[in-house]
Amino acid sequence: MLQQILQDMYIDPELLAELSDVQKHILFYKMREEQLRRWREREAWDALAQAEGLRPAKVKRASNKHLQWLLGADGEVWVWVMGEGPGDKPYEEISEELIAERARLQAQKEAEELWRQKEAEITKKFRDALANEKARILAEKWKVEMEDRKAAKILEERIHEEFKRKEEEERRRGEEQIRLQEEQRAKELYWTLKQAQLHSQASENEEREWEEQLRRSKAADEERSRRAQRARDEYRRHSLRAIQKGTVAGLSTMFQELGQNHEQEARLYHQLPDTSPPSPLTGPDRTWERPLRPLSREVIVRWFKEEQLPRRAGFERNTKSIAPWFHGIISRESAEDLLENMTEGAFLVRVSEKIWGYTLSYRLQRGFKHFLVDASGDFYSFLGVDPNRHATLTDLIDFHKEEIITVSGGELLQEPCGQRDSPPDYHLLFE
């Protein structure tokens, strides 16, 4: 499935919605790598073709654009030197005036913004204070008798006038403070702009900035390469750890036991009507032609019976019992309802309606995560998250009971979420 997406450079929006944030980041990173690889390959072919004379080098087209100088009365190019013309001010004076005007306008703009903020703060401050005081007075007014209400009203008006007077004083102090800040800021901006004008004549700063940007860009590329290498080393470590813990050995033992116990396998599939006992070492029926993607529930049910039942998908290891974590074709909302009242680490596996595979729904401390499991090939693996490939679906689940799914999330499968209704939601898959 991932190879098909990278080949077409397109992913279905419905399938994209099923991916988690980590899966989306990894998928977009892979697509960007594929774009760079194609571009480098095309550039190499073009260079090789030009070197061997198979393709002529690109020639710049002649431009129709031209420049025409303004001529004076004497027929020469018209030139005006600022500050040297009749009635012109000296260049230094013009420059000083421009800098002073820019500083004044900038300081005025900043002062207006500061005053708006200050005025809003003052208004809010006294509005809140007045509201609190009114609330206090209102509470007291309910306690007094009818003859005291007039006195309370007079007191309220006096307090209101006092607050208004204090507000006016605060406004005057705020305006004076803003005015002083405006003058100070105008002076600072004047000297800042003056120094910037003097320094702008040297080009060494621009050169150093360009070199610094280039250095940062190279450092960022190296950091991304190191992160990718660390991720590959982490995945390789998980694979080696799984081999050391006997996952592969257990898989071989399972196939040997299945090959030696055909009668037990026949009794298992005798319970499923219209399904013959398959051999554990043989592939799916070649008369079944799988579409590019699931089209309907009927097609998904047939795919499961034709391709997944022979691979014992959904069964416990070395038994004929269906795993407690296995569910049928249920929606994302139904899966989250089942996991709602369970603790962090609870999980279930449901048959996907978007891809040929499954969706592992995981319970977080707050919320849920959903991982797509690709089963379109001869193995089972998480789509875009974990490069490890597993021979059976049960191997994948058992592996991640001991190893986390993603390094960033630290998801570890702990408690399976079983069935709640009768018949179970997977009964159509085994009829």
Curated annotation (Swiss-Prot):
Keywords: SH2 domain
SH2 domain sequence ranges: 325-417
Family matches, as InterPro entries: SH2, SH2_dom_sf, SH2D4B_SH2
PROSITE patterns attached to this UniProt entry: SH2 (PS50001)
Chain segments carrying region Disordered: 201-235
CDD domains according to UniProt: SH2_SH2D4B
Family annotation (Gene3D superfamilies): SH2 domain (3.30.505.10)
Composition bias, Basic and acidic residues: 211-235
Listed SUPFAM superfamilies: SH2 domain
Entries under PANTHER family matching the protein: SH2 DOMAIN-CONTAINING PROTEIN 4B, T CELL-SPECIFIC ADAPTER PROTEIN TSAD
Entry protein name: SH2 domain-containing protein 4B
